[in-house]
A protein has these predicted regions:
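Beta-lactam-recognizing serine transpeptidase/beta-lactamase-like catalytic domain environment
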Residues: 1-22, 28-171
Length: 171
């Protein structure tokens, strides 16, 4: 039949299949920023296209060409990619300047800060449900400094649906 789709029975897919979650991690990214001192309270940052040397622009959907000052709360409300990227840049020990190059000096520390915070919410670790074939997600050991930026808005590591459900239930 035209337009028909084949479906596969996958009763355990919520614990075995992983995907890159995207914006859902932004609450945990804010937590990592607060705990590390990279940001404080409802700090205002400028949501603007992020221009890193020799890289494509990173934008937020609502300000893909312009800029706008937003608080941490608004960054969640508007799902700001660039607010999260600025947190990652601060975790790298740098301040955002258009056209900047990223230093790799604090790359491991920054990624560890993000991943450890995410793990506290259940992402990238076993849920303890004791079900067969549970995946802990896909957490690459090798990464570069650009991956730290994309990790901050959920476009690098991959998690299971049950991990994300646990995360959402904990917040």
């Amino acid at each position: 039949e035209q337009g028909a789709k084949d479906f596969k029975a996958d009763a355990l897919g919520t614990i075995t299949d992983v995907f890159t979650p995207g914006s859902v991690v932004k609450g945990a990214t804010l937590t990592a920023g607060w705990r590390s001192g990279a940001i404080y309270g409802d700090q205002v940052l400028t949501d603007q296209p992020i221009n890193i040397a020799s890289s494509p622009l990173i934008t937020s959907w609502f300000t893909n060409k312009g800029s706008r000052a937003i608080t941490a709360t608004q960054a969640l409300e508007y799902s700001s990619n660039t607010y999260m990227v600025q947190i990652a840049i601060k975790l790298l020990g740098q301040q955002y300047v258009p056209g900047m190059s990223l230093s790799t000096d604090n790359m491991e520390k920054a990624m560890t800060t993000l991943r450890d915070t995410y793990a506290e919410f259940g992402m990238g670790v076993s849920t303890g449900l004791d079900l067969p074939g549970e995946s802990e997600g896909y957490i690459p050991k090798n990464y570069n400094v650009a991956n730290v930026l994309t990790e901050a808005f959920g476009q690098y590591d991959s998690y299971t649906t049950i991990q994300l459900a646990q995360y959402v239930a904990s917040i």
